[in-house]
């Protein structure tokens, strides 16, 4: 017999049998070795064959291993083993059986038949296990489906559906699929397309996360429950596992061979199987190399003839990119658009999924948490879709609560650390013999025993609370199993089992759960096992950096005295500070328009009066850092071509992948202060971009992504009209001056731009009385730098007055003050410190001497 007439699987099994004989120190390769190798072969035909013939393959494996251990062992074979006479006889018999059946190659299942017909130990073991020529022959016919073995890889193609698909209807029967709430219209439309005579292949198209895969799972559940038209009853929904199909296909044609096996198996099912291909676009081009056919082209004939009932799922972008390009493939599918559900629909979906997540995380999810997850995710997470983002919020909030339950409570942890600290001190004091140490040791022992008692009491309480939580968990799991069992009983029409569960077990479990939940509510002191809206807000704040949680008392107080906080840094600009503070308060109180930025302001005024400083102070107030501000110098955007830098280069231009300067900054930090400095210097086209931001709170970048500006404060600064402010300051009141300045502004900016700004704020020129306060603020920064080096410094009132006079210039505002501090204080101080005149540790006093500020110690 020629070994090259064996199928690939049979050849591999023969090699494994040789290895097994060597490992057992046997002189010959016996039929037992080959049978053991065939039984243990991954993806082999023998194990499923025996199972379908009603033989226990596990028990047979044990019997064969025992027989192998009884075979004679020979030492010093030198790694040379030969096939035994028995094995050669059985293999020749296999060849004879293959020829009788008209096979071109010998497949491994014929070995079982040949072993039964020959005499020997293996035949006896097989017969003892219940194998007969009749039942093995019948199982072979069933496995082959009336086909001959005309290909060396024929065995790999067998049971292709089992290997390369996942049975969704089976998973639905076992209750492993999440319930599908709503989506009735999409499921009905899918069923409608599946009922067609030809081209009965729906493709579900929608954004990522809207629930395309869930619709197919819903279809599988409806088929199981018999809630489908007659034409679909009893069908199976199989999901194609593209990973398994491609994995390990090393040689040209191996992938196509597997796919052909799947298609052949589907053709044999005669329309009883609906194939679900998730990420349908992966089929286009899969397996293509140097002119070879790809998977998409192999599917076309089966799809057109109606042999293959297929449901695809893909996103809008990928459908356009891959499937629309191939018109022949596109026409074979019927589009079913899956839209994003509304907030109300999402709440219904979350209520349906609630029990599954409670069961997984062992926590309780409250209804306010569900409502908060749907509404907050819709409001604050713009770049993802419902219900996916809301489900993720619930999942992560439940996970964080579970983590707290599993870890030691803070109170216990604090006591534990204190006990360790006391024990260390106790060890040190035990080595001392003086009276004070003994007295301290007695006190310490008393405190230690007290803390240990507290710890043990708390630990008992913690363990009891954990136990009560796990008790409710067990009841919930039992209840879930009972609900699955009642569904299974309903499908098979087992009325006795249904009534037993419906009126006996389920009400009893529900009663137990209610009692356990009430007990839990009373006793919980250390552990929280409820997910509330506060936890949802906390998780969302962690994701986006947007503070959506309920305001703490401290934050309320902080917001109410926001003006005072800002006045610590910005002197003499009451109108500007009030306008900004009111905008922030409106936003945090939830009264601001949700579709516009928190606030948009145009700050007008001469140079050096605090326009940029107010932005920094606001960023510091909101985010505790001056750096938490997106600062864009608009003088960089004076040319027309530089405008695209804000939103990103268009397709086809260099830098398209990099994104925009403004849009990327806001995508990364959606809650921020955006400062557009010297806005009048920008090219007029920049204002066209800003119109969209100021009105709708959103902007589309170069790659077509929508960036959300609704949680930003947009501040633009400009020097327009500053000459008027300088001239008329003191003559007119604020309202008149603002009117004059707005006249100048309206000549430079278009009406639709000015109209969209919340407030135009005019800054006053600074008076001499303001400069003294600003001098103190700037000197505090100098004091801080000197303190770090060990110097303490005080300034006299005369020195402060002189500094304010020297640093005051009505045209340049507070900027000359910085230069005055540098020249009159910092320069002399630096010289004196370096020369050693001023030493650390002593107070430095700044005083006036002959119209000069001098430092003395």
Curated annotation (Swiss-Prot):
GO terms for cellular component: cytoplasm; cytosol; membrane. It comes from Escherichia coli (strain K12). Changing residue 332 to A: Loss of ability to form oligomers. Part of a stress-induced multi-chaperone system, it is involved in the recovery of the cell from heat-induced damage, in cooperation with DnaK, DnaJ and GrpE. Acts before DnaK, in the processing of protein aggregates. Protein binding stimulates the ATPase activity; ATP hydrolysis unfolds the denatured protein aggregates, which probably helps expose new hydrophobic binding sites on the surface of ClpB-bound aggregates, contributing to the solubilization and refolding of denatured protein aggregates by DnaK. This is Chaperone protein ClpB. ATP 2 binds at residues 605-612. Residues 3-146 form the Clp R domain. Residues 341-545 are annotated as: Linker. The keyword NAD does not apply. Residues 766-857 are annotated as: C-terminal. The Clp repeat (R) domain probably functions as a substrate-discriminating domain, recruiting aggregated proteins to the ClpB hexamer and/or stabilizing bound proteins. The NBD2 domain is responsible for oligomerization, whereas the NBD1 domain stabilizes the hexamer probably in an ATP-dependent manner. The movement of the coiled-coil domain is essential for ClpB ability to rescue proteins from an aggregated state, probably by pulling apart large aggregated proteins, which are bound between the coiled-coils motifs of adjacent ClpB subunits in the functional hexamer. NCBIfam families: chaperone_ClpB, PRK10865.1. Keywords: Acetylation, ATP-binding, Chaperone, Coiled coil, Cytoplasm, Nucleotide-binding, Repeat, Stress response. One peptide binds per ClpB hexamer; the binding site is formed only upon ATP-driven oligomerization. Induction: By heat shock and other environmental stresses. It comes from the Bacteria. SMART domains: AAA, ClpB_D2-small.
């Amino acid at each position: 017999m020629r070994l090259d007439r064996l199928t690939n699987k049979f050849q591999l099994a023969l090699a494994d049998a040789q290895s097994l004989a060597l490992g057992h120190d046997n002189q010959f390769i016996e039929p037992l070795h080959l049978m053991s190798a065939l039984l243990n072969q991954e993806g082999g035909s023998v194990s499923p064959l025996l199972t379908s013939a009603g033989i226990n393959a596990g028990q047979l494996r044990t019997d064969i291993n025992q027989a192998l251990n009884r075979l004679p062992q020979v030492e010093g074979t030198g790694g040379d083993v030969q096939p035994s006479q028995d094995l050669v006889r059985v293999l020749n018999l296999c060849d004879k059986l293959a020829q009788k059946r008209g096979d071109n190659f010998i497949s491994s299942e014929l070995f079982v038949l040949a072993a039964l017909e020959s005499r020997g130990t293996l035949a006896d073991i097989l017969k003892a296990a219940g194998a007969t020529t009749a039942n093995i022959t019948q199982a072979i016919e069933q496995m082959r489906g009336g086909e001959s073995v005309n290909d060396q890889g024929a065995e790999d193609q067998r049971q292709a559906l089992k290997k390369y698909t996942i049975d969704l209807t089976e998973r639905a029967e076992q209750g492993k699929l999440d319930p599908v709430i709503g989506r009735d219209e999409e499921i009905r439309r899918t069923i409608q397309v599946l009922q067609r005579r030809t081209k009965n292949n729906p493709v579900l198209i929608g954004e990522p996360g809207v629930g395309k895969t869930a619709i197919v799972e819903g279809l599988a559940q409806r088929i199981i429950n018999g809630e489908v038209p007659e034409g679909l009853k009893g069908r199976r929904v199989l999901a194609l596992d593209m990973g398994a199909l491609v994995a390990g296909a090393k040689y040209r044609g191996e992938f196509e061979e597997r796919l052909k096996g799947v298609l052949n198996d589907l053709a044999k099912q005669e329309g009883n199987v609906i194939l679900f291909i998730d990420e349908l676009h992966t089929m286009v081009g899969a397996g293509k190399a140097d002119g070879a056919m790809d998977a998409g082209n192999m599917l076309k004939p089966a799809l057109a003839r109606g042999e293959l009932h297929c449901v695809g799922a893909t996103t809008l972008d990928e459908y356009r990119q891959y499937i629309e390009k191939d018109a022949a493939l596109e026409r074979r599918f019927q589009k079913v658009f899956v839209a994003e559900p509304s907030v109300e629909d999402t709440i219904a979906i979350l209520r349906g999924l609630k029990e599954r997540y409670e069961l997984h995380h062992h926590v309780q999810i409250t209804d306010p948490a569900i409502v908060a997850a749907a509404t907050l995710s819709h409001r604050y997470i713009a770049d993802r879709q419902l219900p996916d983002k809301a489900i993720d919020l619930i999942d992560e909030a439940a996970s964080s609560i579970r983590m707290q339950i599993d870890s030691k409570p803070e109170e216990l942890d604090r006591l534990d650390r204190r006990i360790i600290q006391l024990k260390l001190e106790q060890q040190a004091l035990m080595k001392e013999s003086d009276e004070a140490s003994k007295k301290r040791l007695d006190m310490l022992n008393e405190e230690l025993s007290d803390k240990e008692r507290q710890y043990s009491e708390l630990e008992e309480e913690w363990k009891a609370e954990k136990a009560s939580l796990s008790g409710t968990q067990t009841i919930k799991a039992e209840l879930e199993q009972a609900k699955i069992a009642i569904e299974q009983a309903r499908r098979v029409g087992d009325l006795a089992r249904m009534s037993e569960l419906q009126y006996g077990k389920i009400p009893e479990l529900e009663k137990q759960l209610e009692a356990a939940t009430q007990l839990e509510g009373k006793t919980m002191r250390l552990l929280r096992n409820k997910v509330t809206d506060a936890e949802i807000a906390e998780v969302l704040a962690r994701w986006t950096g947007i503070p959506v949680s309920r305001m703490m008392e401290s934050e309320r107080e902080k917001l109410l005295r926001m003006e005072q906080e800002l006045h610590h840094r910005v002197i003499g600009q009451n109108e500007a500070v009030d306008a900004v503070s009111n905008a922030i308060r409106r936003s945090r109180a939830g009264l601001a328009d949700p579709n516009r930025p928190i606030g948009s302001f145009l700050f007008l005024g001469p140079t050096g009066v605090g326009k940029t400083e107010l932005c920094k102070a606001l960023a510091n107030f909101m985010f505790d850092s001056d750096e938490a501000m997106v600062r864009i110098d608009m003088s960089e955007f004076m040319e027309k071509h530089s405008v695209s830098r804000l939103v990103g280069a268009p397709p086809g231009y260099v830098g398209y992948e990099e994104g925009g300067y403004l849009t990327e900054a806001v995508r990364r930090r959606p809650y921020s202060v955006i400062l557009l400095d010297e806005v009048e210097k920008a090219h007029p086209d920049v204002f066209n971009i800003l119109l969209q931001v100021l009105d709708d709170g959103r902007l589309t970048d170069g790659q077509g992504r929508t960036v959300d500006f609704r949680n930003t404060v947009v501040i633009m600064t400009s020097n327009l009209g500053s000459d008027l402010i300088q001239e008329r300051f003191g003559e007119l009141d604020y309202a008149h001056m603002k009117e004059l300045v707005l006249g100048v502004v309206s000549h430079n900016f278009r009406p639709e731009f000015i109209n969209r700004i919340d407030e135009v704020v005019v800054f006053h020129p600074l008076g001499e009385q303001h400069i003294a306060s600003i001098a103190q603020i700037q000197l505090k920064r100098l004091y801080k730098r000197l303190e770090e080096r060990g110097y303490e410094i005080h300034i006299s009132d005369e020195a402060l007055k002189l500094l304010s006079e020297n640093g005051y210039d009505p045209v340049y505002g507070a900027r000359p003050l910085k230069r005055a501090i540098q020249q009159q204080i910092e320069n002399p101080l630096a010289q004196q410190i370096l020369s050693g005149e001023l030493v650390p540790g002593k107070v430095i006093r700044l005083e006036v001497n002959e119209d000069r500020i001098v430092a003395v110690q």
